[in-house]
Regions:
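C-terminal alpha-helical "lid/dimerization" subdomain adjacent to the S-adenosyl-L-methionine
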Residues: 58-116, 122
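Conserved SAM-binding strand-loop segment of SAM-dependent methyltransferases
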Residues: 2-14
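A short acidic, Gly/Pro-enriched loop at the edge of an enzyme's catalytic core
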Residues: 14-25
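A short glycine-rich, Lys/Arg-flanked "PGG" loop and its adjoining helix->strand segment in the class I
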Residues: 39-54
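Core SAM-dependent methyltransferase catalytic element
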Residues: 110, 116-155
């Protein structure tokens, strides 16, 4: 059963193939940590959202419960070994561990969302910070002068 108003797209998160103020919501799950220029991607998402439109990000994050750290580190070290055993290639699983470690912590990502122009920014930790859901809203303001770089030549 399809939904006429629901659209899934695949593209460069830093240069979205969408006009300004064209989305009611944007969701990215376990993908932001793979984006090279996260600030640019967040700005592009804000421009693509209609005023009041919501962004929701589900991503691995940083532990908030220090008691979980030894178990988490041990578990993280197993990913490449299990990946090697199952697929014969440890490198994607090593990348997973490294990309999680390099991803901004909860407060840094919250600040990045605010810098990108989102309002009502916050986050909820899941599983003691193993993952977090960040959210923000495109502000209600006149953005007629804002330009999505993907469509700059069309404006």
């Amino acid at each position: 059963a399809g939904h006429a108003s629901l659209m899934f797209i695949q593209g460069d998160a830093e240069l979205l193939p969408l006009p300004n103020q064209s989305l009611d919501a944007a969701i990215i799950g376990f993908g932001l940590r793979n984006v090279t220029d996260k600030e640019k991607a967040l700005r592009a998402m804000r421009l693509a959202l209609k005023p009041g439109g919501r962004l929701v990000i589900l991503e691995f994050s940083k532990l908030t419960h220090p008691g979980l750290a030894p178990l988490y580190q041990k578990f993280s070290g197993l990913w490449p070994k299990v990946g090697q055993w199952i697929t014969g290639d440890a490198s994607p699983y090593q990348y997973l561990v490294e990309s999680i470690a390099m991803h901004p912590d909860q407060e840094t990502l919250k600040s990045m969302l605010q810098t990108a122009g989102f309002a009502g920014v916050g986050y909820d930790n899941l599983l003691g910070g193993v993952a977090a859901i960040h959210y923000g809203e495109a502000p209600f303001q006149d953005e007629k002068t804002a330009t999505n770089p993907a469509f700059a030549s069309e404006l």
